[in-house]
Amino acid sequence: MSLVAQAFAASKIVPDVIPTPPSVNIELKYPSGAIASQGNELTPTQVKEQPNVSFNADPDSFYTLVFTDPDNYDGPELVYREWHHWLVVNIPGGDVSKGDVLSGYIGSGPPEGTGIHRYVYIVYKQPGKLSFDEKVLTNKSIDGRAAFSTKKFAEKYSLGAPVAGNFYRAQFDDYVPLLYKSLGV
């Protein structure tokens, strides 16, 4: 079992988010200089801007990138549903900037008092260029982000098992209220 697969299993991303772990790492470098590394702790301040994403990719294939928080809270109770932060599809080769953005990037914003959250990046190799019928979401609102299921999304579009993944952990910091204000929360 690869180190990525071991980290996903140890952190319970398998089975909380996906049934099968990826085996290859996604490199995630943020403009702040922070680097995600299979469960290290970063701050919302460090990850507020969209990262540079790289992964081993076949230049003739298309990929889907999902960024999700499976530790979503409704008030003080953990409700075990995902809140997706970024969704990019039809990525040609590994060039995320040329993919179709279905959900604009929103950085981590764990509510105060909810402890540490897992923030998970998953890449799927698509069977070809696909048509997606999801509502396109901007990064200016939280509408349509909650109650997401990476597993159901992957099943709906026949994406198969994930090919790459990475994650970090984060908890509330002073940037979170600023993020909420920018989202109208």
Give the ranges of each region predicted by the language model.
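N-terminus-centered regions that define maturation/targeting leaders and the start
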Residues: 1-185
